[in-house]
A protein has these predicted regions:
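Bacterial Sec-dependent N-terminal signal peptides
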Residues: 1-21
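Short S/T/G/P-rich N-terminal loop/turn motif that feeds into the first structured element of a domain
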Residues: 18-103, 112-249
Length: 249
């Protein structure tokens, strides 16, 4: 299978602060089916999503592979993630329209290239954008899930302390973007309430960022995260970008 990995240049106007809604679909694919799954998604279903973008039913979409996909074959863990970006909740509520014209877009019965039989949807999460930096080209993403004790304090520090720090470091050491989302649904005692993301141009830069000691101590000394989120990130995941689609007006 030919390599379909692409760099994506994302602009701030792709996601309007405080407005856009993000839906994340997590899939598990057995290791012996990953090549087939990725081929079908890129060759066929990317056309369906592009048509939805062209028709105004979707702003943007990204297709990711989890770093250990195909290496650790745990059926309870995601191997891939689809990110769908909607203008607002109204557009999200009409998301079924994305797939309604699949047959017309493809020109044949879409069930013949379906991926449901070779993958399992483990969960779907919806978020609302709080803030982010203008994004640059990236190849890897780190998603940080948290359930802070003080959500308002957590968000305020991210915007007032960490965002300026990250902005200053855009383009340095492979760093390419940052953002923060609030969980909309599902919600619960065992669910993260917020997600932050970091983007990187290389695997090495992403791995360096995951290192426990790789923090600017001048920033850490000003942080009150030990109060806002005493337990730290509940989970962190490293993903590789396969494809990004979307245009901005």
């Amino acid at each position: 299978m030919k390599q379909l990995f692409k760099y994506a240049l994302l602009f701030m106007s792709t996601i309007v602060m405080g407005q856009n809604v993000i839906e994340v679909h997590y899939r598990h694919v057995d290791s012996d089916k990953i090549a087939e799954f990725e081929y079908k998604e890129n060759e066929y279903w990317s056309k369906v999503k592009q048509a939805a973008i062209n028709d105004g039913n979707l702003l943007a979409t990204a297709f990711f592979r989890v770093a250990d996909a195909g290496i650790v074959d745990d059926p309870t863990m995601p191997t891939h993630a689809f990110v769908l970006v909607f203008k607002d909740f109204e557009q999200l509520s009409n998301s079924k329209s994305i797939w309604a014209n699949a047959g017309k877009v493809l020109g044949f019965d879409p069930s013949t290239v379906g991926t449901d039989e070779i993958s399992k949807t483990l969960m779907v999460q919806r978020y609302k954008l709080i803030d982010e930096l203008p994004l640059q080209e990236f190849k890897y993403a780190v998603w940080n899930y948290s359930k802070p004790k003080d959500l308002n304090g957590f968000v305020e520090e991210n915007i007032k302390l960490w965002k300026p720090h990250f902005k200053k470091n855009l383009g340095k050491n492979g760093f390419a973007g940052w953002g923060i989302f609030a969980r909309v649904y599902p919600q619960g005692m065992n669910e993260s309430s917020v997600l932050t993301y970091d983007h990187y141009t290389t695997l090495a830069s992403a791995m360096n960022a995951l290192s426990p000691m790789d923090y600017d101590q001048t920033i850490v000394s000003k942080s009150k995260m030990s109060e806002y989120d005493p337990n730290g990130f509940r989970y962190r995941v490293l993903l590789e970008l396969i494809e990004f689609q979307g245009s901005v007006n």
